[in-house]
Amino acid sequence: MATRHQVRQSVISLLYAFELNSQNNVFVDEILDEKKIRNEQKNFTLNLYNGILDNLNNIDETLNSFLNDNQITALGHVERAILRLGAYELLFTDTPSAIVINEAIELAKELANDNSPKFINGVLDALIKAKK
């Protein structure tokens, strides 16, 4: 059974593929099968992924307000996907903020460049503070 961390890795893969494939969802089952995401974890993955897509404009507008020199669209695909996942979980789920931040940092360490964990932590931390 996949862990929640592996589920979040899969969501990042789905968001990345979504952008590269001109927003065509034919890749969803292929990615989930490849990563062995099944049953409850598949439902959790799809809920996160679809929730992000359903709220994408709101998420991006919110993130843009915390990006000093950039717009969300100017960031790399991986960093953008991690920020969107983190923002979605902070804004639309009951996942504790400490877990969201920790997962986002770990994903950035694994998947993005060396400066990304600190950057992602700063943006999501600012979002948490503004939400209070």
UniProtKB/Swiss-Prot annotation:
The domain of life is Bacteria
> What is the organism lineage in this UniProt record?
Bacteria, Pseudomonadati, Campylobacterota, Epsilonproteobacteria, Campylobacterales
Disulfide bonding pattern of the chain? none
SUPFAM superfamilies assigned to the protein according to its UniProt record, in alphabetical order: NusB-like (SSF48013)
Give the family, as the similarity comment puts it. Belongs to the NusB family.
Alphabetized UniProt keyword annotations: RNA-binding, Transcription, Transcription antitermination, Transcription regulation
Gene Ontology cellular-component terms listed:
cytosol
Gene3D superfamilies cross-referenced by the UniProt entry: NusB-like
Main function:
Involved in transcription antitermination. Required for transcription of ribosomal RNA (rRNA) genes. Binds specifically to the boxA antiterminator sequence of the ribosomal RNA (rrn) operons.
Can you say what this protein is called? Transcription antitermination protein NusB
Primary gene name: nusB
Organism whose genome encodes this protein:
Campylobacter jejuni subsp. jejuni serotype O:2 (strain ATCC 700819 / NCTC 11168)
